[in-house]
Amino acid sequence: MEHELYFDCTLTEYSWSIKTENKIVNQIREHPPAYLSGGKLDIKEEQQSKCIAIHVGIYWGLGVFIIKDHDVVNVMCDSEEIRDLMTQNRKVDDQIINDKIYFINQLTSHRNLKINYKVIKSESNLATELLSTNDKKSASRNSRGFV
């Protein structure tokens, strides 16, 4: 099966939308305080947050059985910069980003996923609206109802 993963973020929260055929599932989460990760996830830059959103979106999609082994996941990037970061397979001077890329690649390998990174226009990003609405329109902050 083929899925589209949209994601967006701020320094305090991140959202993702998984589109499969005609169904869209929206989720939003706050970044936990850095002390909960022993300081490892002290988010200071948007790129860090975007890498976390991609990782969590794929991981969550697998966990609630939307994404399954051998599926195709089209990760819809709203910048060439993040697409290049995810596809160039090189280390950067940021441990959070390196760790997230490693975990995404590990998930991809273990679950035999085909990941394609595609650049889209920002206004086409389904996950952006989730961050910009005060009532968190149609986005769940937990996984109840999915598992």
Where does each model-flagged region fall?
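Intrinsic disorder/low-structure terminal segments
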Residues: 5-6, 64, 116, 145
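RNase H-like nuclease fold core
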Residues: 1-48
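Positively charged N-terminal leader segments that act as targeting/secretion signals
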Residues: 137-146
